[in-house]
């Protein structure tokens, strides 16, 4: 038994280091793939940077000043701190449909005119070749919807100001300066600056679509917190257009602010004009009451103390009135726990206490003085209110006639000379990094997913003797390989027809040399066997068993030995294609009793050995192999040939190898480098041993010299020359 220990021993202490070296080796092995993918992504990034439409950015600066309060309340500025300008509502106003809608109407932004280029790369190529874009000036355009959908028109420039307009179901000719109408479409072209044959695509979107598009490229932000300085920015591919749009938005915002301020002043002025007669009437009544009382009391005048108290009371009342007006404004902006609101309430409480103190002093005066004081206070308070209203009326009249609002444009719109997109250097760097990341990730993922045997030590760790490691023949691989199944698979597909025979067509190949080494090993391995029949099978399909067995037959035949090659793979055997011999009469016909030996044995002249091909595919391959004729064939061959090589199907696919193996003296199992796992090889050999087959060991076929494998297992030559560990 060669599979003495099927359990994998514990990993060495250098396992992590080996894994790291293996991954580094994988990157080195696939360096061409990594370089190619990275270069591809970098070139894509370069092409994108060169061909994509440059995007420019324009900006303008607008200042929102603190709104001026009522002139009556100006005396409170020392008591109540000024609040910062409210920028958030102004930002929302700038982005509103009211402001943007006016700009869209002014600049006809509903109309879309685009020159027609070759898809994807046409515009960028025209820009790289310095081709001047055409210009189309439209003074009026109306394109109705068609079946509820926006329709596009194609305008083709002609000679001498003529053009052709194509739409859904119509084609009409027009001329610059003349109105064109067709099927509801109305168009007036003011000017055309383009070569004949140039095409433009015309379309018209709704106002809401235009506003949404504008909002997508227009941003407003406050330059610094509570500064009132608003920065308006816009991006687009037309630097002149975005400048005009920004200036229009800023001007429309300024005009609406002025109009709003004028409307407020007008309403306040109307209110004052209604209130002034009433206040004047109340003042006249108060003065008349005071005069009547004095006449009744023989012109009673206030003493000095009463006059002083009167002035104080009137002053306190005026301040309380101002606080009442101010509270009405503050309550709309702040809650009662706000510092500004609390300062106002504290001031009111102080004034209320002062008024109570003054009222106590008045209560101590004679009744006549108290009445005169009360009437005088009414007159003074009414006169103060009346004068304040008169002053405010004059201020509002002046403000209305010269309204400037609380907004001003600091910096008109300017477009930066260099585009903000694409960022060419950044795109190229990102493309390089992305390509490197994807290629390295794919290589490492493939390495992680790969579980195939890559070194003889992996099999020997499972107690499996490795008789030879046969390198991949690049010469043969180039002539037979089709393609991989996918990126993450190691399995190669090869042709099974019109393929060269390596042992004859390129006998100096390293793979043939490795088979010669196998011939030497087999000479000693088969010295004590019961017969000279060698069975070669594989763990799974595509392991290369036919290549190994056929090459071994040729190599042994070259040493002047009589060799018979039997293709016992009755399902997928293709040795007849390899040897270019007939497959009409083969093993299946002999086992079925249709043909005799002299009819199925053919001589392969180039290889120097005899061949029994597969024959026609039978419906019952396993049953045929179990017949006595198969045993009789092997006994006859053992007597008439120096060596008989039997190529059987893969062990894990079908049980044919176990059937044939009981009649042979020596068996070898072929494992494909990177394809078959150690577990598959162990399981195959276990099944053969359970069937009573004398399985000597394994052959590692298709070995590829890799840096990753060399780092992990440290062998330097295929099959029989391992580096010594110091």
Swiss-Prot record:
Residues 1-32, 446-726 are cytoplasmic. It catalyses: L-tyrosyl-[protein] + ATP = O-phospho-L-tyrosyl-[protein] + ADP + H(+). It is an enzyme of class 2 (transferase). InterPro entries: AAA_dom, Bact_polysacc_biosynth/exp, GNVR, LPS_length_determ_N_term, P-loop_NTPase, Wzc-like_C. Its main location: membrane. The chain crosses the membrane at residues 33-53, 425-445. Pfam families: AAA_31, GNVR, WZC_N, Wzz. It is a multi-pass membrane protein. Residues 54-424 are periplasmic. GO terms for cellular component: plasma membrane. Keywords: ATP-binding, Cell inner membrane, Cell membrane, Kinase, Membrane, Nucleotide-binding, Phosphoprotein, Transferase, Transmembrane, Transmembrane helix, Tyrosine-protein kinase. Its EC number is 2.7.10.-. It comes from the Bacteria. It is found in: Cell inner membrane. The keyword DNA-binding does not apply. CDD domains: BY-kinase. Belongs to the etk/wzc family. PANTHER family: TYROSINE-PROTEIN KINASE, TYROSINE-PROTEIN KINASE ETK-RELATED. This is Tyrosine-protein kinase etk. The gene is etk.
